[in-house]
Amino acid sequence: MNIKTALSRIVDHLDLSTDEMRDVMREIMTGQCTDAQIGAFMMAMRMKSESIDEIVGAVSVMRELADKVELKTLDRVVDVVGTGGDGANIFNVSTASSFVVAAAGCTVAKHGNRAVSGKSGSADLLEAAGIYLNLTPVQVARCIDNVGIGFMFAQTHHKAMKYAAGPRRDLGLRTLFNMLGPLTNPAGVKHQVVGVFTPALCRPLAEVLQRLGSKHVLVVHSKDGLDEFSLAAPTFVAELKDDQITEYWVEPEDLGMKSQSLHGLSVEGPEASLALIRDALGKRKTENGQKAAEMIVLNAGAALYAADLATSLKEGVALAHDALHTGLAREKLEELGAFTAVFKVENEG
């Protein structure tokens, strides 16, 4: 099916099949569509609302066209990732949590990009920390093998996304493409914590990942609007485990944490986010640093559970707490910077 035929279907509020969506996405991702067609398609899909079949089709094409990272095993390899777009502008929780997860002995294949709507995306933060981002897939795999954590810069691994970049920017609205990033990890991880910008996406995205072969995934949105677990409010979870999806709410107290305000955790940019994270992963000299540390532990604990290193969310949080207090997470951050610096010399001379 071509994009013109698809558009005539979508404007009549008719869903595309998975195969039809694959056809259209291949057209878009191989440069065969005009910007006007892509913009119209994104807008029509948003107005109709994307079906699970359509999201599965779109994700499968993006995965197919990605520059993949080949790992020795995907067993207990995890990604902590969010759609962004929650408008909260708090520090980079998922990225900071990834270093605690690595410190706990779990392998992390982190996928991320620059900021979508916030002040600091994962790529912006890591760049501020002196981590070199323009790595080849082989170099990312070496980071993961040697440091226990590696970062896959979305725009490097999903070059075909360039064809949709202009229409996305011009529309300035959330579209199908906002939810594709977290579902298209170039290493093909089967264990994830995926934060989303609305609770309405939790179950559908869990179903998409179930169809695509994921093993243990938590798709989450907190009641105070975050695309991650919150200290300040209950968090809604759609959990895929043992090929079953269960939905539930989690309070911080359920996981051995104290509910508290997120005041002081908003940042104006990557440098401020980095300073707060370094304090949280280090000596926690400030009140905000201590609070940030607890937010990090909460989300790292969820990742350790998703990776099956813990048998429950509460046990995962306890493991993350212990890992944070070893100081190893801060060391992992610096180690990744030093390790990627070698690749910068290799790639740029």
Swiss-Prot record:
Cofactor(s) named in the record: Mg(2+)
Residues that, per the record, bind Mg(2+) 1: 94, 228
InterPro entries reported in the protein's UniProt record: Anthranilate_Pribosyl_Tfrase, Glycosyl_Trfase_fam3, Glycosyl_Trfase_fam3_N_dom, Glycosyl_Trfase_fam3_N_dom_sf, Nuc_phospho_transferase
Residue runs in coiled coils: none
Gene Ontology CC, one term: cytosol
Catalytic reaction(s) noted: N-(5-phospho-beta-D-ribosyl)anthranilate + diphosphate = 5-phospho-alpha-D-ribose 1-diphosphate + anthranilate
Subunit composition and interactions: Homodimer.
Name of the protein this chain belongs to: Anthranilate phosphoribosyltransferase
Organism this protein belongs to: Pseudomonas fluorescens (strain Pf0-1)
Name of the gene this protein is made from: trpD
